Amino acid sequence: MRRIILASASPRRKELLKQLIGDNFVVYPSSYEEPPQPGLDPEELLLKHSVEKARDVAKHFDSGLVISADTSVLCEGEVLGKPGSPENAEKMLEKLSGKKFRVITGLTVLDLDSGKETSEFESTNVWLAELSKEQILAYVRTGEPLDKAGAFAAQGKGAVLVEKVEGDFFNAVGLPLFRLGKILERLGVSVFDEGFS
């Protein structure tokens, strides 16, 4: 069985990967700093970040598969990352309230044994309910939105704010499992192998 390395500190990505392959992976967060890249469209930027994260972690291992991802929310042409503060979370939720937007992820799998690097992009449409100021403030007070792209967690308390999801739901959580499964399959790794349980 191949060693799998998740290049992320995200508890959501860890839980999602665990759904696919059990505990058969190691977590090694990337130390890559995401510099501003003016002129790149959001998809290119997320792919670039996921590639750089995978390459950063790959330097610490001599074999296995490194999986990395970078996720943002795109609403009306604006990229919304993690808010980082309650004030920014409020602003983001006000912007997303009652709207359709896209959750976009750049995904990279780097095969250290063959040197093959696969990077792909996933997009999921999400419709957020019309939120009152009180709902926004109450949700922000939970602390949940502060470290989430777009200031909401589709898998947490934020689930009650989501009216509809079109596409890979798991992408809206932070790791597009369908696309990841297809990439792993092309690299000769099946999540249905007995070793992954």
From Swiss-Prot:
EC id: 3.6.1.9
Instruction: Show which residues form the site (Important for substrate specificity).
Output: 12, 71, 155
Cofactor(s) named in the record: a divalent metal cation
**Subcellular location per the Swiss-Prot or TrEMBL entry:** Cytoplasm
Q: Which reaction does it catalyse?
A: dTTP + H2O = dTMP + diphosphate + H(+); UTP + H2O = UMP + diphosphate + H(+)
Kindly give the Pfam families that the UniProt entry links to this protein.
Maf
GO terms under biological process: nucleotide metabolic process
InterPro entries on file:
ITPase-like_fam, Maf-like
Q: Which UniProt keywords apply?
A: Cytoplasm, Hydrolase, Nucleotide metabolism
Top-level EC class: hydrolase
Positions annotated as active site in the UniProt record: 70
Q: Which NCBIfam families match?
A: maf, PRK14365.1
Entry similarity comment: Belongs to the Maf family. YhdE subfamily.
Q: In UniProt terms, what function does this protein have? A: Nucleoside triphosphate pyrophosphatase that hydrolyzes dTTP and UTP. May have a dual role in cell division arrest and in preventing the incorporation of modified nucleotides into cellular nucleic acids.
Protein name (database record): dTTP/UTP pyrophosphatase
The record lists the organism as: Methanosarcina acetivorans (strain ATCC 35395 / DSM 2834 / JCM 12185 / C2A)
